[in-house]
């Protein structure tokens, strides 16, 4: 499957809106295509942002892994001061919708609340420092929450190792297959990859 097939993901996005009964009043516009296809869901008349749709790449996450993620989000929402984008239930009462795409693959779709915000400005060092400090505080809350929640051991999540991150069987695919990869960049990154692997062994 060509993950860059935007038309395919657009079709899945439109089909997912029907699972929420939103197909008449909302439209989904692609934000980014990476390990997931992420869409902004807006009201057609008012332009109001009603949610963010995430379409998982087939084979990237299992349904159990995504359900675990939904449970953890609920715990974070209920037991920490952190503001999280909660999943919105479909007409069937489920957080995760399964859509069969035009290619015959099943796609897992989740719409979460829209939370306003902005990406870090890499040209504003002072702002970046503040945002990374806040990111550190947020990460600390998440670590603490996993320590005190007795449901953590029941979560089915991807295991992050050298092999699943940048190895030959990486979850996001082989980084060497990046269309704009140059031979110089590949040589440098290959050396970095070998150093990382050696240090982790």
Predicted regions, residues:
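Juxta-kinase regulatory segment immediately upstream of eukaryotic protein kinase catalytic domains
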Residues: 1-27
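An alpha-helical support segment within catalytic cores of ATP-dependent transferases
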Residues: 9-19, 148-151, 166-201
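Short secondary-structure junctions
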Residues: 17-25, 79-83, 201
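ATP-binding glycine-rich phosphate-binding loop
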Residues: 20-42
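Short beta-strand
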Residues: 28-32, 86-89, 153
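Active-site acidic catalytic loop and adjacent metal/ATP-binding pocket
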Residues: 34-52, 87, 190, 194-201
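ATP-binding pocket architecture of kinase catalytic cores
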Residues: 43-150
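A cross-family kinase active-site recognition segment
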Residues: 122-184
């Amino acid at each position: 499957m060509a993950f860059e097939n935007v038309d395919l993901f657009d079709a899945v996005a439109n089909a997912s809106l029907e699972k929420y009964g939103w197909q008449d009043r909302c439209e989904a516009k692609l934000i980014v295509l990476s390990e997931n296809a992420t869409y902004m869901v807006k009201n057609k008349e008012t332009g109001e942002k009603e949610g963010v749709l995430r379409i998982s790449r087939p084979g990237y996450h299992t349904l159990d892994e995504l359900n675990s993620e939904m449970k953890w989000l609920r715990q974070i929402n209920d037991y920490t001061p952190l503001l999280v984008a909660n999943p919105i239930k479909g007409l069937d009462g489920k957080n995760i919708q399964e859509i069969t795409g035009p290619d015959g693959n099943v796609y897992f779709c989740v719409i979460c609340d829209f939370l306003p915000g902005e990406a870090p400005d890499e040209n504003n060092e002072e702002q970046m420092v503040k945002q990374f400090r806040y990111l550190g505080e947020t990460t600390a809350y998440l670590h603490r929450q996993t320590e005190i929640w007795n449901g953590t051991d029941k979560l089915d999540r991807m295991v992050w190792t050298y092999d699943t991150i940048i190895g030959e069987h990486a979850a996001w695919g082989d980084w060497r297959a990046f269309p704009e990869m140059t031979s110089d960049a590949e040589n440098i990154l290959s050396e970095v990859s070998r150093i990382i692997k050696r240090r982790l062994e």
